[in-house]
Amino acid sequence: MRFRDRVVLVTGGASGLGEATARRFAAEGGKLVIADINTEGAERVASSLPDALAVTMDTGDATSVERGIAEAVARYGRLDVIFNNAGIDGQQQALHEMDLANWEKVRRINGDGVFYVLRYGIDAMLRSGGGAIVNTSSTAGLTAQDNISPYTFTKAGIVGLTRSAAVEYAARGVRVNAVAPTVVMTPLVEHFIANAPDPEQMRRQMESFNPKPGIPTADDVAGVVLFLASDDAAWVTGHTIPIDGGYVAR
């Protein structure tokens, strides 16, 4: 029970990777704060956990983030762990044809949003005596891919921000790391495969994307997140861990 009585905030916690990771934290004794722009989804997840609070949070809105973290601290009195996970993919477009609204939306949520959670989350952690943060980057933040420049821009920025925050707060008891998953098998990806013109071909294509055959599950990623957030990783800070079956190593 590595997280017994620790207060854990998960952004984007209403579905997918956020939900799977929240359930893992709860199974190891954590008190969960499920933050999501989808209020109904957050309440659904929170109500299924032993000790959890649902908060409505638009991570791209600083006021919403500040309010949500204040709700968490008001309920539990402290904040020990943050899984800074909320994000979007955006539209696939060539850079010279990029719709500016698409660029701004991805930057606001994936870039500004991660900063806002760090800004207000670290402030709460310092008042609690320290803590651990895990940001969600992507293999797209470590390598170049076509037609997803806003996503790559923001996910690479998370890598740099993770390092900066880790160095800035190491002496004050706050560790900051990141995970960089490849494509993960979530309900959204399952839906994408099922609705492809040739679902079996799409599945085979995705399963051969990385050197290690197959597609990691949300639970595969959650295991790494929990390690980084736990005392097992007490001397690990400032790092981004690819969860990619060797994709970045090629």
Give the predicted meaning of each segment:
Residues 39-40, 57-68, 100, 219-220:
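The beta1-alpha1 cofactor-binding region of Rossmann-like NAD(H)/NADP(H)-dependent oxidoreductases
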Residues 118, 154-157, 162:
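Active-site helix of classical SDR
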Residues 138:
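Residue(s) in the substrate-gating loop at a strand-loop-helix junction
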